[in-house]
Amino acid sequence: MTPVHFSFSSAFILGLMGLAFHRTHLLSALLCLEGMMLSLFIALALWALQFESTGFSTAPMLLLAFSACEASTGLALLVATARTHGTDRLQNLNLLQC
């Protein structure tokens, strides 16, 4: 495993561990998801450069577009829950009561 692959894998795993262990606030969960998506984007962009093919060059842009949609949806949910519940703590959110 090259140092570049190790750094991107460790960045993804750190984001995943942050998502698993620090799930107290919705904002911290969204930041961990964004870190995971950023590491995937950089790894996919380097993978497309490595193969030097035009077919692989659209995949990072597609991932970036989905990441932007995910971020906007997450922020909209964060604003909606902060307005209705008064906090962004994930323990206070119950799908049966919403």
From Swiss-Prot:
Gene: MT-ND4L
Name of the featured protein: NADH-ubiquinone oxidoreductase chain 4L
Pfam annotation, one family: Oxidored_q2
Major subcellular location class: mitochondrion
Entries under PANTHER family matching the protein: NADH-UBIQUINONE OXIDOREDUCTASE CHAIN 4L, NADH-UBIQUINONE OXIDOREDUCTASE SUBUNIT ND4L
Top-level taxonomic group: Eukaryota
A GO molecular-function annotation: NADH dehydrogenase (ubiquinone) activity
Keywords, comma-separated and alphabetical: Electron transport, Membrane, Mitochondrion, NAD, Respiratory chain, Translocase, Transmembrane, Transmembrane helix, Transport, Ubiquinone
UniProt GO cellular component terms: mitochondrial membrane; respiratory chain complex I
EC number(s) on file: 7.1.1.2
Membrane topology qualifier: Multi-pass membrane protein
Family: Belongs to the complex I subunit 4L family.
EC class (word): translocase
Cellular compartments annotated: Mitochondrion membrane
